[in-house]
Amino acid sequence: MPAGGFVVGDGQKAYPGKLTPFVLFTCVVAAMGGLIFGYDIGISGGVTSMPSFLKRFFPSVYRKQQEDASTNQYCQYDSPTLTMFTSSLYLAALISSLVASTVTRKFGRRLSMLFGGILFCAGALINGFAKHVWMLIVGRILLGFGIGFANQAVPLYLSEMAPYKYRGALNIGFQLSITIGILVAEVLNYFFAKIKGGWGWRLSLGGAVVPALIITIGSLVLPDTPNSMIERGQHEEAKTKLRRIRGVDDVSQEFDDLVAASKESQSIEHPWRNLLRRKYRPHLTMAVMIPFFQQLTGINVIMFYAPVLFNTIGFTTDASLMSAVVTGSVNVAATLVSIYGVDRWGRRFLFLEGGTQMLICQAVVAACIGAKFGVDGTPGELPKWYAIVVVTFICIYVAGFAWSWGPLGWLVPSEIFPLEIRSAAQSITVSVNMIFTFIIAQIFLTMLCHLKFGLFLVFAFFVVVMSIFVYIFLPETKGIPIEEMGQVWRSHWYWSRFVEDGEYGNALEMGKNSNQAGTKHV
């Protein structure tokens, strides 16, 4: 059976342009939107392993921790209230991403980023001053609203601002910011946990104000994308901005294509309903399946619950937080590898290599934990070398994710949608991501209690399934201009039956013909 298709040669446009300091600055600032998501992932798992935090808000979990070593280690964190604390954010992000789609389309990408920063800042302040569990959950819900807006707008912003030759690397800046946010949070957790008096968790949770202010202030100074400006009728300003972004005077070909795509977009009255049309079947499939599979790698439970997990396998609180810092450092370093390789090696290669690496590591970790913990979850005293082996393979697993499904799970969906469905489709991507992050966060601690080490084998099974899916159905998108992506689907062995020549890209043909007519006239 043929694998994914590749588009090369004749039909492909090459818009003029270079990587200017201006576009680099705007993409770096916009990518900082990932800090708020990453900081939350890193900070929450850390504070839930701090005894003072658990004693104040989740006393039943704290009491389980204080029991002797005969306690089933798999089940010591199984608490409905603790689960609600962690997972409420993702449900809120799901709801806000649906609203953010309309805001992003009608008012621009920048305004959505601004809303995201403000809402996240409010949630961080409530959590930092929380005195009751309900305050923690309200704060988490506001954090989720902020993340929903930011995750909707930032990947679109980066894909639209970046020159097509550098789109992969610049878009992965979002994932790099997520990993940096995770690492910073884990380092802060390690030091704040040592504060006498047991109030360090307040600094950890309240510290989320800093990344929130970065994206809030950043969104005030950033320009909107030419695509978004054209979509809102600001043609002259968009052309001027496009010249500055690309660093060349002749942007007529790209501009005409953007205008043509915008005209087709404006002819669509119901973008949500339009997503169900046959010609958008490949886009809708990827918008759903890529974020679905991204969460079923198990990465968020590893990063989110890393301190809890390391505590479970025999580390002290300090050692578990430090081990989480190590995995966070690996996460950042491996994401840099992805930035280097995504526009050289392609998306498919990284997806498949990362999947293979994660599969091997999950099998090894399951075997190691199963051999020592058995099914009753009472390992006794773990040798230091044994714990180091487990952490090493978890780090290799994190690296495999960080240069594959981590960044590409945001990059590929954001670059494959035509303008007329782009905002709605990106909202689907964010919503699916948050739905399954919520579900997995909701059931992870219970699954760990019941499936024990077999939980890692469940995630390993899904890694096999998703790798097969990528091999068969995902075409290579490296080096294709964002408004020319229709070629990818028309050339694919399977998706070509849904996306026919006469059915897709008519607006771009109009733009091409308009550009040629203008050239002849001159």
Swiss-Prot record:
The keyword S-adenosyl-L-methionine does not apply. Keywords: Cell membrane, Membrane, Phosphoprotein, Sugar transport, Symport, Transmembrane, Transmembrane helix, Transport. The keyword Coiled coil does not apply. It is a multi-pass membrane protein. Induction: Strong increase at the onset of the dark period followed by a progressive decrease. Transient increase at midday. The modification Phosphoserine is found at residue 252. Belongs to the major facilitator superfamily. Sugar transporter (TC 2.A.1.1) family. PANTHER family: SOLUTE CARRIER FAMILY 2, FACILITATED GLUCOSE TRANSPORTER, SUGAR TRANSPORT PROTEIN 1. Major hexose transporter. Mediates an active uptake of hexoses, by sugar/hydrogen symport. Can transport glucose, 3-O-methylglucose, fructose, xylose, mannose, galactose, fucose, 2-deoxyglucose and arabinose. Confers sensitivity to galactose in seedlings. This is Sugar transport protein 1. It comes from Arabidopsis thaliana (Mouse-ear cress). The lineage of its organism: Eukaryota, Viridiplantae, Streptophyta, Embryophyta, Tracheophyta.
